[in-house]
Structure formats: structure tokens, C-alpha cells
């Protein structure tokens, strides 16, 4: 039936509410989600045997800065293409722009 919208069963539309989204939680330091064991595993993969306790906070700070710059460039590519979804190619091009070529994801 025309004019019924996307409701499915029709009706007058009383009580219809848009899609419910998750409520915003108070922003906390999400960088702390990069846990100490995760940093240890990355260091082990790089061949590190012992890690100073000062390394963890410094690693989080460096990682946060790196990700901010890559995400900023990726979003710039996405906006230029008039899209709202960041694609893998946007990230590949952002990394390439920063001199860190990544293979295996197209482009």
C-alpha cells in the first residue's frame, strides 16, 4: 500500500519509534584497553625478552598518536569520496601516505 512507509503491517503510525541505538556511556580512557599482556605479546613478537614497567604507558601514548593520525587520514579519504563508511582501502591509502605501505588489502 502506498504511503505506509517501511512499517510492514501498515496502520496509522501511532507509537512508531525509530531504531533504538545504544546509550552513550561516559567516555573513559579507552587506550587502557590495550592491556599490559597485549603489549608484552607484541614485544615478544618483536624479540624483546624483558620489559621495563615504564614501557607500557609510553607504548600506549605512541600507539594512540599513530592511530589518531591514520584514522584522521582515513576519514579524510572517506569524506572526499562522499561516503560515510571507512573502507579498508581508505586505511591502506592513509598508511601509504604516511610511508608505511601495507600489502594484502587491495590498492
UniProtKB/Swiss-Prot annotation:
Keywords: Chromosome, DNA-binding, Nucleosome core, Nucleus. InterPro entries: CENP-T/H4_C, Histone-fold, Histone_H4, Histone_H4_CS. Coiled coil: none annotated. GO terms for molecular function: DNA binding; protein heterodimerization activity; structural constituent of chromatin. It is found in: Nucleus; Chromosome. Residues 1-16 have a biased composition (Gly residues). It comes from the Eukaryota. Residues 17-21 bind DNA. The keyword Amino-acid biosynthesis does not apply. GO terms for cellular component: nucleosome; nucleus. Residues 1-23 are annotated as: Disordered. Its main location: nucleus. Core component of nucleosome. Nucleosomes wrap and compact DNA into chromatin, limiting DNA accessibility to the cellular machineries which require DNA as a template. Histones thereby play a central role in transcription regulation, DNA repair, DNA replication and chromosomal stability. DNA accessibility is regulated via a complex set of post-translational modifications of histones, also called histone code, and nucleosome remodeling. Belongs to the histone H4 family. The nucleosome is a histone octamer containing two molecules each of H2A, H2B, H3 and H4 assembled in one H3-H4 heterotetramer and two H2A-H2B heterodimers. The octamer wraps approximately 147 bp of DNA. This is Histone H4. It comes from Euplotes crassus.
Amino acid at each position: 500500500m502506498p504511503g505506509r512507509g517501511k512499517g510492514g503491517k501498515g496502520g496509522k503510525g501511532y507509537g512508531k519509534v525509530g531504531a533504538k541505538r545504544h546509550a552513550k556511556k561516559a567516555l573513559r580512557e579507552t587506550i587502557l584497553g590495550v592491556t599490559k599482556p597485549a603489549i608484552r605479546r607484541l614485544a615478544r613478537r618483536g624479540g624483546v625478552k624483558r620489559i621495563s614497567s615504564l614501557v607500557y604507558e609510553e607504548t600506549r601514548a605512541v600507539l594512540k598518536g599513530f592511530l589518531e593520525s591514520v584514522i584522521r587520514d582515513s576519514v579524510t579519504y572517506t569524506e572526499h569520496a562522499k561516503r560515510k563508511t571507512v573502507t579498508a582501502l581508505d586505511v591502506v591509502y592513509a598508511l601509504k601516505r604516511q610511508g608505511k605501505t601495507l600489502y594484502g588489502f587491495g590498492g
